[in-house]
Amino acid sequence: MDVAFESPYWKKFQYICGVDEVGRGPLAGPVVAAAVIFDRYFEPSGILEQIDDSKALRHETRVLLSSEIKKQALSFSIAEISPEVIDEVNILQATFLAMNQAIEQLSPIPEFLLIDGNRFKTTLPIPFETVVKGDSKVFSIAAASIIAKVHRDNFMINLAERYPEYGFAQHFGYPTKAHIEAIKMFGRSKVHRKSFKLSCLGEK
């Protein structure tokens, strides 16, 4: 992926920030957002030319890319929102909260935001544009999706040591058949989202 999408924005702004989230759909664990700024007129080379939507990449490639993105980015930030907060405010608002926290932690402060998706609610006076399927179109959004995905996967792998009965290291909290069977057998843990109801278990 190249930086063709960012190029016209760099003519107006120095600090363009790509933002994406991962973990909206799982039954357990946090929603995670990442924000990434590259130098103005940055040209990806080497392994960074492989950057794509994180879902389209092999795990090993994502890990390598995440490390290299962190080295070459001007600034990056990651934010987590817990299952408790997700249950309190709903997953959409929790996603906005994660994205805003990631943006607020950046230095320098971005001048323009490119947000994956079709809507966003900002807490900062920074102009933005939402891009549907931005993680497959926009270099900086794809980079954010990769570091968010790797961060969350590692988080869930660590959780698997505390809650081995749920198989988090295999499905990362997503509603697979094995995960639903584990919930049926053991109930929900402290890291499960109580507001995500399973009709197959008779929950309403």
Curated annotation (Swiss-Prot):
An individual GO BP term: mismatch repair
Keyword Metal-binding: yes
Record InterPro entries: RNase_HII, RNase_HII/HIII, RNase_HII/HIII_dom, RNaseH-like_sf, RNaseH_sf
Reactions the enzyme catalyzes: Endonucleolytic cleavage to 5'-phosphomonoester
Enzyme class: hydrolase
Chief place where the protein resides: cytoplasm
PROSITE patterns assigned: RNASE_H_2 (PS51975)
Positions annotated to bind a divalent metal cation: 20-21, 116
Localization per Swiss-Prot or TrEMBL: Cytoplasm
Cofactor annotation: Mn(2+); Mg(2+)
Single GO term (MF): RNA-DNA hybrid ribonuclease activity
Note describing how the cofactor binds: Manganese or magnesium. Binds 1 divalent metal ion per monomer in the absence of substrate. May bind a second metal ion after substrate binding.
Enzyme Commission numbers on file: 3.1.26.4
Top-level taxon of origin: Bacteria
Every RNase H type-2 domain range: 14-204
One GO cellular component term noted in the UniProt record for this chain: cytoplasm
Keywords, sorted A to Z: Cytoplasm, Endonuclease, Hydrolase, Manganese, Metal-binding, Nuclease
Pfam families xrefs: RNase_HII (PF01351)
Entries under NCBIfam families matching the protein: PRK00015.1-1, PRK00015.1-3
Function summary: Endonuclease that specifically degrades the RNA of RNA-DNA hybrids.
The family this protein is said to belong to: Belongs to the RNase HII family.
Name of the protein in question: Ribonuclease HII
Organism: Chloroherpeton thalassium (strain ATCC 35110 / GB-78)
Species classification: Bacteria, Pseudomonadati, Chlorobiota, Chlorobiia, Chlorobiales
